[in-house]
């Protein structure tokens, strides 16, 4: 048997990336395809329908564009014979969901629905279902639902049930016309294979499914809304299969589009961050993997099911078969730094960066690195896009304290870097306090490759060594590993994801170690961060929510005046 290859496709927030990998984990070729429609958060394409605040949609056709463009590109770049590609795997943002009809066609592609926002793909960061999430949590808590502690006591507005309920409340006709609500990762697998299967990862983390108990009871859904009573056996029906399972094989039509052979094995869908865990070679407990990009997803393996405040979930076999997979997260990290660079930096910084031939991020990082911990006099709460863990509240907002007339842009930048590190420390503390050990940190994604200052701050704030993924596209490599498992040993692949990770997972030799004097200062700053965190985040002062409410009320009044 000659040399064999697998392809992993990572569907991110703004683009899709295909990576062609050999069975030793060497990356042979990669290609990024930006989504033509990007993130739709202001106006629907073609119809000019205005979207309300907190909406974030996507066009499902963009996902197919990635298959049609990126896969042929990596084959062409590498010169690899398509016959030597034994499997394809994908990972996706989640919960990114869409309504489809009985043939599997997204409702937004039908002429009668294209002007209706609720027919489109709801991206993971669509936060307009917060009212439904609040009521769901209130009812679940009153009923003493057993599932609630598994999700840190709160179900997020980002997840499947809240989003479905929002559709039912605001567009009941679209709900009625929907045959299935699908995770986008499962829909793309359906398009590739013709097989409609749901993966255990998104079902467990985003749809309140449990390996032993299944979905919550009909009685619970009836208590939410009588119209939801039969949701799980109708619009959420379908087999739920473990990660690493073969979903099916490429159809002739899709193989022709992608430049591969019909019959090529396709792994069940996965979540971007979760695919990154084997991507860095982590297949055992005690090693926290941080997938760092626009947001951070924190993943950890355990041998028991423990209840931890603010977790996105604990799911048996949810990341690596044989372990309980814990997920936590921060709703905005890279997005905060990008916001500051785009919206908050004075013109002279942009001009200076341009003159030096560096990006604004690099210019700020270089100057921020000259400061010692505490020297900026600033402290921030990293809630620019709400708080995912441990407070699970999208209505919280960002805060910076300590400004003076002498505050410089690089000081603000450093304070924002530090704030996200404190947010990660809060998550680590929650794990440890509830009996789930965190001994080592692993970082992957775009940020660790770009920002050394950020990684040193994380090492100092958490007082733990951080290992960095060797790959710049770890989730795609992880997805490729699952493709190797789906292909099977008989076709040159692997027996299990553990075997695949041991042979294909890689980290850099360079690590970031905590600097003791920095650790001591950050410990004091973290105590202050915790006071702010609890004061503004646990109900003592809900000023952030009141401000958000007044903002929305004022906007609504302004819009109604414009319409009249």
Swiss-Prot record:
Pathway: Carbohydrate degradation; L-arabinose degradation via L-ribulose; D-xylulose 5-phosphate from L-arabinose (bacterial route): step 2/3. Gene3D superfamilies: 3.30.420.40. One of its GO terms (molecular function) is ATP binding. Its EC number is 2.7.1.16. This is Ribulokinase. Belongs to the ribulokinase family. SUPFAM superfamilies: Actin-like ATPase domain (SSF53067). GO terms for biological process: L-arabinose catabolic process to xylulose 5-phosphate. Keywords: Arabinose catabolism, ATP-binding, Carbohydrate metabolism, Kinase, Nucleotide-binding, Transferase. The keyword Translocase does not apply. It comes from Geobacillus thermodenitrificans (strain NG80-2). The lineage of its organism: Bacteria, Bacillati, Bacillota, Bacilli, Bacillales. It catalyses: D-ribulose + ATP = D-ribulose 5-phosphate + ADP + H(+); L-ribulose + ATP = L-ribulose 5-phosphate + ADP + H(+). The gene is araB. GO terms for cellular component: cytoplasm. The keyword Ligase does not apply.
């Amino acid at each position: 048997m000659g040399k064999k290859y697998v392809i992993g496709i990572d569907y991110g927030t703004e683009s899709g990336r295909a990576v062609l990998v050999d069975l030793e984990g060497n990356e042979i070729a990669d290609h990024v395809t930006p989504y033509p429609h990007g993130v739709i958060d202001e106006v629907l394409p073609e119809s000019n329908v205005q979207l309300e605040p907190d909406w974030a949609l996507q066009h499902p056709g963009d996902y197919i564009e990635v298959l049609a463009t990126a896969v042929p590109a990596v084959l062409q770049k590498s010169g690899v014979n398509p016959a030597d590609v034994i499997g394809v795997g994908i990972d996706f943002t989640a919960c990114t969901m869409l309504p489809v009809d009985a043939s599997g066609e997204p409702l937004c592609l039908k002429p009668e629905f294209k002007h209706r926002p609720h027919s489109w793909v709801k991206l993971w960061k669509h936060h307009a279902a917060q009212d439904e999430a609040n009521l769901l949590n209130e009812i679940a808590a009153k009923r003493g639902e057993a599932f609630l502690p598994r999700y840190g006591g709160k179900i997020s507005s980002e997840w499947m049930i809240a989003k479905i309920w929002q559709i039912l409340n605001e567009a009941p006709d679209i709900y009625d016309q929907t045959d299935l609500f699908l995770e986008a990762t499962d829909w793309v697998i359906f398009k590739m294979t013709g097989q409609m299967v749901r993966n255990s990862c998104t079902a467990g983390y985003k749809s309140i499914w449990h390996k032993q108990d299944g979905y919550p009871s009909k009685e619970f859904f009836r208590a939410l809304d009588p119209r939801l009573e039969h949701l799980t056996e109708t619009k959420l029906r379908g087999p739920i299969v473990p990660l690493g399972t073969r979903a099916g094989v490429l159809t002739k039509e899709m193989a022709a589009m992608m430049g591969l052979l019909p019959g090529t094995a396709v792994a069940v869908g996965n979540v971007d961050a979760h695919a990154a865990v084997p991507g860095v070679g982590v297949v055992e407990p005690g090693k926290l993997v941080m997938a760092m990009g626009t947001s951070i997803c924190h993943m950890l393996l355990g041998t028991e099911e423990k209840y931890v405040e603010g977790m996105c979930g604990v799911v048996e076999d949810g990341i690596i078969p044989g372990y309980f997979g814990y997920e936590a997260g921060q709703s905005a990290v890279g997005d905060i730094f990008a916001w500051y660079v785009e919206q908050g930096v004075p013109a002279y910084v942009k001009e200076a960066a341009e003159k030096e031939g560096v990006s604004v991020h690099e210019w700020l990082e270089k100057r921020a690195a000259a400061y010692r911990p505490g020297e900026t006099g600033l402290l921030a709460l990293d809630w620019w896009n709400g708080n995912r863990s441990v407070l699970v509240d999208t209505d919280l907002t960002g805060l910076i304290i300590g400004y003076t007339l002498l505050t410089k842009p690089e000081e603000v930048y450093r304070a924002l870097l530090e704030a996200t590190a404190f947010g990660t420390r809060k998550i680590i503390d929650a794990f440890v306090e509830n009996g789930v050990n965190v001994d080592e940190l692993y970082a992957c994604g775009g940020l660790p490759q770009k920002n050394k200052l950020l990684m040193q701050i994380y090492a100092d704030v958490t007082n733990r060594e951080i290992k960095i993924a060797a790959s710049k596209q770890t989730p795609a490599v992880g997805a490729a590993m699952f493709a190797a498992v789906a292909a099977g040993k008989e076709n040159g692949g692997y027996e299990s994801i553990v075997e695949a990770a041991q042979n294909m997972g890689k980290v850099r030799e360079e690590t970031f170690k905590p600097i003791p004097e920095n650790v001591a200062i950050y410990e004091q700053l973290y105590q202050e961060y915790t006071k702010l965190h609890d004061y503004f985040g646990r109900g003592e002062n809900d000023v952030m929510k009141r401000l958000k409410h007044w903002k929305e009320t004022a906007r609504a009044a302004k819009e109604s005046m414009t319409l009249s």
